[in-house]
Swiss-Prot record:
GO biological process: 'de novo' IMP biosynthetic process
Entries under SUPFAM superfamilies matching the protein: Glutathione synthetase ATP-binding domain-like, PreATP-grasp domain, Rudiment single hybrid motif
Pathway assigned in UniProt: Purine metabolism; IMP biosynthesis via de novo pathway; N(2)-formyl-N(1)-(5-phospho-D-ribosyl)glycinamide from N(1)-(5-phospho-D-ribosyl)glycinamide (formate route): step 1/1
InterPro entries, per database record: ATP-grasp, ATP-grasp_carboxylate-amine, ATP_grasp_subdomain_1, PreATP-grasp_dom_sf, PurT, PurT/PurK_preATP-grasp, PurT_C, Rudment_hybrid_motif
Enzyme type, top EC level: ligase
Protein's recorded name: Formate-dependent phosphoribosylglycinamide formyltransferase
Source organism per UniProt: Aeromonas salmonicida (strain A449)
GO CC annotation, single: cytosol
Amino acid sequence: MFGTATRPSATRALLLGSGELGKEVAIELQRFGIEVIAADRYPNAPAMQVAHKAHVLDMLDGNALRALVTLVKPDLIIPEIEAIATDTLAQLEQEGVKVVPNARATQLTMNREGIRRLAAEELGLPTSPYRFAQSKEEFIAAVEAIGLPCVVKPVMSSSGKGQSVLRDLAKLDESWTYAQEGGRAGRGKVIVEGFVPFEYEITLLTVRAVDGIHFCDPIGHRQEDGDYRESWQPQAMSTLALARSKEVAAKVVGALGGYGLFGVELFIRGDEVWFSEVSPRPHDTGMVTLISQDLSEFALHVRAILGLPIGTITQYGPSASAVVLRDGHSQDIRYQGIGAALALVSGAQLRLFGKPEIAGRRRLGVALARGQQCEEAVEKAKAVAARVEVIC
């Protein structure tokens, strides 16, 4: 049973993290009349602009997080970012507050150490070789053990921040410093991964719901500077590789438990599959589903966490997303050329996230398009994104 938003009967959802992905989740929640309370570390975040209420706090502060939960009395807490006081979430869950998919999944996936140890050491899934390092000395030893080239990442970061490929020992200090600066919680532990000779990466959106486990078609994507620039669906792959990918994804989400959508990241080479990472929430590369499917990743996540059946997911054919990424400094961003951008491609769509400021490089929107093939859809989406003029 759902109540009516803002009324005594309201079913309340507290979003912890209010970026562009949280914004789409908030919109989907409101389609079911759910009252949405959006929280983040800065005011006027994208999801706050469409929520019923908004709160600003440091979500790594357990006392502040507990105080907010006491104030808003949510029926469910929906973590949308990694930088959250997960120990407090676990305590709240033990006290009867519903965390989706569950507090353990949030704890394990908020840092790469927890999920890598689950996947490789408990589930026995194929992964790249890895070592963790807390100090500069441990980092040097880890690089020596793994060998070059290797991938260096903070154990806690998002959108590629702090990630680098280390190919030359002369760049060792630079790689360590970059990882320390890119961590969501500041300086801390890093993971050093052996370089997997993969042909491509996919995101396999996997939904665990009341009516079982469901898979979206695989999503391919291109990364640059550790962040996604374009994604497309479906990614072409062999029947065996897809079957193995689904097997890996099902094992991971089954071990994490709870209902929701999970973004499972995998490396593929021929028929071989390696597990990379998983997020227990919508994935940035999955924004392509806003145009590629009848139920976007956000709609699927909301259905699952509300205990509703998924049924059949219908895919519309080759589709793509391309980010609107700009550099600048402004607290009053303006956009022009929207009409010209949309006129370029019949059926194209555009989402501007409404981010309140820019300081350096920031993802401000996403263009969406379909085509006869994925390559065509990507070029269309890139053309639309490039035509948007950002005035800082």
